[in-house]
Curated annotation (Swiss-Prot):
Residues at which a cardiolipin binds: 216, 309
Subunit structure: Heteropentamer. Part of the GPI-anchor transamidase complex, consisting of PIGK, PIGT, PIGS, PIGU and GAA1.
Lumenal side: 23-78, 245-286, 373-384
Gene: Pigu
Binding site for a 2-acyl-6-[6-phosphoethanolamine-alpha-D-mannosyl-(1->2)-6-phosphoethanolamine-alpha-D-mannosyl-(1->6)-2-phosphoethanolamine-alpha-D-mannosyl-(1->4)-alpha-D-glucosaminyl]-1-(1-radyl,2-acyl-sn-glycero-3-phospho)-1D-myo-inositol: 383, 385
Origin organism lineage: Eukaryota, Metazoa, Chordata, Craniata, Vertebrata
Species in which this protein is naturally found: Rattus norvegicus (Rat)
Family: Belongs to the PIGU family.
Protein's name according to its UniProt entry: GPI-anchor transamidase component PIGU
């Protein structure tokens, strides 16, 4: 499989290199769908200019990236394009090896359950085969590297790509069972964009599963391991934050980065749900609604952890999708990360109810973003309502798509244990309903 992966990497790098050299690069870097006030490369360049002048990059209201990012590009500014191409390649490679290991775990678990007669007798067609799973890691790498969203994000030099890499390595180290490295990469991802803190729960659940520790409140081993992982994560995060302080000799980055993410002061239009509401809202209501909007990212973590405690990787996929939809400054690069996992759940396609319609909605919305932006900003024949309408449709499409995957996953799990052909008490065919 090394040769096909290498071929995909070569094609992906070639496409990116060609776009970097084209006249489209400047246009793409200005697109509000691709960059946000947090991830814009132009803002990074302005922060670097301030740093070179001996001024704190956070002294203005322009730069909102983390100190480690600005010091990384302080030394690599001349190789920025190469850095972003390597970043995308590393993300794809990490996902490739993560899913390769995950498939081995899934097949081993499936084999054990078959030997123990835990599956219903009529579900042979739902059982996954090694041949079916063989090319899934390659498809994941392909879905990530050649996804137009990922390519646009790379060409725009959006720092979202770096956050995706950190999350990908967190997933890889978690699936590999490396507790310490998992905690470090989760801390780095949290440091970079705050919201990945919600991935702590699925990461912990998977590591507990790998250590054969039952998820029970009365289990002493459960609490000891959870405490150890939490301390590794918290300790890593504290070290990274302190390192940032020593680099800058200031705590200015905390309100400039994390305060900015949470309070949403910059209402530049993007593909998220925040900007339009807060642009139209009275100032004295804003704090309440900021809390209401922000809680969406965190609110679903506990119920999902309870429902999916036996399936932490699917939980992780759902949580990454929730972050990309409900974060304050999303870009298409965030969407690309969870879309890369679609091949992993290819066995759910038969249970998806609206996949064609929802796929069409997302594609059409993606094409209409620049059209409605042009009509609003340049032609003056539309207003913000038009652009936000397509943004809202895009996000509703994502929510329904993820809900469809969630329903399909639960439906398949139910069929595996209760049988594929359900009957009611009167002998008629029964229909499975999600409540």
């Amino acid at each position: 499989m090394a040769a096909p992966l290498a071929l995909v990497l070569v094609v992906a790098v070639t496409v990116r290199a060609a776009l970097f050299r084209s006249s489209l690069a400047e246009f793409i870097s200005e697109r509000v769908e691709v960059v946000s006030p947090l991830s814009s490369w132009k803002r990074v360049v302005e922060g670097l200019a301030l740093l070179d002048l001996g001024v704190s990059p956070y002294s203005g209201a322009v730069f909102h990236e983390t100190p480690l990012i600005i010091y990384l590009f302080h030394f690599l500014i001349d190789y920025a394009e190469l850095v972003f191409m390597i970043t995308d390649a590393l993300t794809a490679i990490a996902l490739y090896f993560a899913i390769q290991d995950f498939n081995k775990v899934v097949f081993k678990k499936q084999k054990l359950l078959l030997e123990l007669d835990q599956y219903a007798p009529d579900v042979a067609e739902l059982i996954r085969t090694p041949m079916e799973m063989r090319y899934i890691p390659l498809k994941v790498a392909l879905f990530y590297l050649l996804n137009p969203y990922t390519i646009l994000s790379c060409v725009a030099k959006s720092t979202c790509a770096i956050n995706n890499t950190l999350i990908a390595f967190f997933i890889l180290t978690t699936i590999k069972g490396s507790v310490f490295l998992s905690a470090i990469f989760l801390a780095l991802a949290t440091y970079q964009s705050l919201y990945p803190i919600t991935l702590f729960a699925p990461g912990l659940l998977y590591l507990l599963q790998r250590q054969y520790i039952p998820v029970k409140v009365k289990s002493k081993a459960f609490w000891i391991f959870s405490w150890e992982y939490a301390m590794m994560y918290t300790g890593s995060l504290v070290v990274i934050v302190c390192l940032s302080f020593f680099l800058l000799s200031s705590w200015d980055f905390i309100p400039a980065v994390y305060g900015f993410i949470l309070s949403v002061p910059d209402l530049t239009p993007n593909i998220g749900l925040f900007w339009y509401f807060f642009a139209e809202m009275f100032e004295h209501f804003s704090l309440f609604f900021v809390c209401v909007f922000q809680i969406n990212v965190f609110f679903y973590t506990v119920p999902l952890a309870i429902k999916l405690k036996e399936h932490p990787i699917f939980f992780m996929f759902i949580q990454i999708a929730i972050i990309s939809i409900f974060k304050s400054y999303p870009t298409v690069g965030d969407v690309a990360l969870y879309m890369a996992f679609f091949p992993v759940w290819s066995h759910l396609y038969r249970f998806l109810r609206n996949i064609f319609v929802l796929t069409c909605i997302i594609i059409v919305c993606s094409l209409l973003f620049p059209v409605l932006w042009h009509l609003w900003i340049y032609a003056g024949s539309a207003n913000s309502n038009f652009f936000y309408a397509i943004t809202l449709t895009f996000n509703v499409g994502q929510i329904l798509l993820i809900s469809d995957y969630f329903y399909a996953f639960l439906r398949r799990e139910y069929y595996l244990t209760h049988g594929l052909y359900l009957t009611a008490k009167d002998g008629t065919e029964a229909m499975l309903v999600l409540k």
